[in-house]
C-alpha cells in the first residue's frame, strides 16, 4: 500500500470514528486533508538520518501518525493518554500495517527514557514545558519540531537558538538538542 493510499484510508477512518467519538475538530475531508498537509509540510526541514521519533500528545494522529506513514523507515512512539484517541491510533496502526509505530496510552512522563532523534508535538502545551517534558529523551543531536500557532513569539523569551518556518497561520519551531539541554 502506498503512502497516499494509507493517508486516504486514514482520512476516511478518522471521519468515520470522529462522528461517534469526537476525536478531532476536523469534520470534513478537506479539513482532515489540511491537517495532513500541515503535518507533512515539516518533512522538508527534517534531516534524513532520523532512526526514531517520539510524538507527544498524538491525539487523532497529527502530526505523529501522519509522519509515521510518510517515514516508514523511522520507528515512532506515539503517546496519547486519552482512551478513545489511543484506541483509534492502535486501530490505524493495525489496519495500515504500521510496523514502525508503537502507541502508548500514557502521558509522555510515564514513558521509559530512550534517546530520540526527533521529538514532535502539536498544540499540546507551551514550548518550555514541552522541552522540560522531553529532556529525558533529548541528546545533543536530537531535533525538536513543535507545531505552534500564531502566538509563538511569547513562548520564545529567553531562548536564543531556534528556527521558525511558516505555512499560513502555522509556525513550525525547530530546535536542536544541544541548544536546549
From Swiss-Prot:
Enzyme Commission code(s) on record: 2.1.1.170
Gene Ontology molecular-function annotations: rRNA (guanine-N7-)-methyltransferase activity
A Pfam family per the record: GidB
Superkingdom assignment: Bacteria
Binding site for S-adenosyl-L-methionine: 57, 62, 108-109, 122
Record-level GO cellular component terms: cytosol
Enzyme class: transferase
InterPro entries named in the record: rRNA_ssu_MeTfrase_G, SAM-dependent_MTases_sf
Localization in the cell: Cytoplasm
Keywords for the protein's UniProt record, in alphabetical order: Cytoplasm, Methyltransferase, rRNA processing, S-adenosyl-L-methionine, Transferase
Record field: catalytic activity: guanosine(527) in 16S rRNA + S-adenosyl-L-methionine = N(7)-methylguanosine(527) in 16S rRNA + S-adenosyl-L-homocysteine
SUPFAM superfamilies: S-adenosyl-L-methionine-dependent methyltransferases
Protein family per UniProt: Belongs to the methyltransferase superfamily. RNA methyltransferase RsmG family.
HAMAP family: 16SrRNA_methyltr_G
Function: Specifically methylates the N7 position of guanine in position 527 of 16S rRNA.
Protein name: Ribosomal RNA small subunit methyltransferase G
Organism: Nitratiruptor sp. (strain SB155-2)
UniProt gene name: rsmG
Amino acid at each position: 500500500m502506498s503512502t497516499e493510499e494509507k493517508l486516504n484510508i486514514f482520512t476516511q477512518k478518522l471521519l468515520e470514528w470522529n462522528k461517534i467519538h469526537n476525536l478531532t475538530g476536523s469534520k470534513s475531508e478537506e479539513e482532515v486533508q489540511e491537517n495532513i498537509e500541515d503535518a507533512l509540510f515539516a518533512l522538508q526541514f527534517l534531516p534524513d538520518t532520523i532512526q526514531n521519533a517520539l510524538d507527544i500528545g498524538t491525539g487523532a494522529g497529527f502530526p505523529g501518525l501522519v509522519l509515521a506513514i510518510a517515514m516508514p523507515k523511522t520507528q515512532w512512539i506515539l503517546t496519547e493518554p486519552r482512551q478513545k484517541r489511543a484506541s483509534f491510533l492502535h486501530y490505524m496502526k493495525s489496519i495500515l500495517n504500521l510496523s514502525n509505530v508503537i502507541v502508548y496510552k500514557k502521558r509522555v512522563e510515564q514513558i521509559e527514557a530512550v534517546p530520540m532523534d526527533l521529538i514532535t508535538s502539536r498544540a499540546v502545551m507551551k514550548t518550555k514545558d514541552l522541552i522540560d517534558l522531553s529532556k529525558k529523551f533529548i541528546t545533543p543531536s536530537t531535533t525538536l519540531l513543535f507545531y505552534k500557532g500564531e502566538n509563538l513569539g511569547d513562548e520564545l523569551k529567553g531562548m536564543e537558538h531556534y528556527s521558525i518556518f511558516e505555512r499560513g497561520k502555522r509556525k513550525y519551531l525547530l530546535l536542536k538538542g544541544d541548544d536546549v539541554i
